[in-house]
Amino acid sequence: GGTHLPDITLVGPVYDGSSSQLIGYVASRAHHSDVGGTSPGSMPLANEIYQEGLRIPPVRLYTAGGRNDDLWRTVLATVRTPVERAGDLDAQLAALHTGRVRLLELVARRGVDEVVGAMAELIAYADRLLAAGIQRIPDGRYEAQDTLDDDGFGTTDIEIKVALEVHGSRLSLDFTGTSPQVRGGVNAVAAITASAARYVVRCIVEPLINEILPAGGGSMSSVDLLLPEGSIVDARPPASVTGGNVETSQRITDVLLGAFRQALPDLIPALSQGTMNNITVGGTDPRTGDNFAYYETVGGGMGAGPTADGLSGVHTHMSNSLNTPIEALEHAYPFRVTRYGIRRGSGGDGAHRGGDGLRRDIELLSDGTVTLLTERRTRGPAGANGGEDGAPGRNILIRQGEEEELPAKVALDGIKGDVISVRSPGGGGWGEATP
């Protein structure tokens, strides 16, 4: 299923040229920095999905090799940065082409029957590995819960609960008791919760069996997922879901790790920063007169583990974002980065220290709309086995030299000269610190 509206997925079939047999599909999913909606960057403080941007149902972009130009023009007409969007969509199409070519090259070498058979065997192989890994987890019922700071519209302490049950080679993850979906955009669709569960299960199983669990249908075949309909882990339309993908997914991961920690206390690390620290800025670039839409996530502290300190200034868990170099940022946008570095001392103390967060200060060189979508501003990431919690994050507006503390989720009209300071959480410590 989908994640949130800025994530656009292209899927194409691959047919064997000689037999016209459907071999499989190639797919590309990419986050687009603007897909319309009420604010630049398409990460608004929305209270329904209609405010978040363009909703694209499953439609044909290409038919018999020809592009649907009406659809193409419609998509580009609804976004603030059409040239950038066209380039990103073309890149996704190129990825599909490359995947199709590589798969057909494999078929040409080994034959369609062998390739299709290998696909089925890979799924079965993953199923066997998963079952073997689950069998190494002690049978029992393990419960955990955690909270989101707020939804940006006044609802606080939004709970996520899970009950993990292990029986032989099967496990179930029951989210009964989780808070109902809320007005603000921290609701997650079922696909997000399933993705977080898949990620955590792989993280747990792989070290237990000392094997890499292949991604695919077999990697969740022995896992039962129970999601209460209409909750923040299985939200229903017209719920706002912008932050479900980037923030709630992190908390789901934290809760799942908390449940597994009860079963495997010497394996699971302390909590990492638990947020992607999303920042978007949009407006008109005075250098060109063109619209711009900037979106970035900021790394933070990794939780410490039983054998090592946590890393500082990195993304963890449900994020694969990389650091954006200052030079590239200042070249592309009307910004000046006035400070960027490690937030020393923000990691939790312990036998192994949690990683430190980051501080990133961006000065606006023109007026623009600013949106922050963050978490772990109320409570820092928890330590484990006696380790201390990491420091909570902070969002600060520096205007004419005066600092103003901003909430975890906020939209504001930025003025030329404003500095937006994002200070990300540190990771939790692991084990009691020695005197």
Task: Enumerate the predicted regions with their spans.
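Glycine/proline-enriched, intrinsically flexible loops and inter-domain linkers
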Residues: 1-435
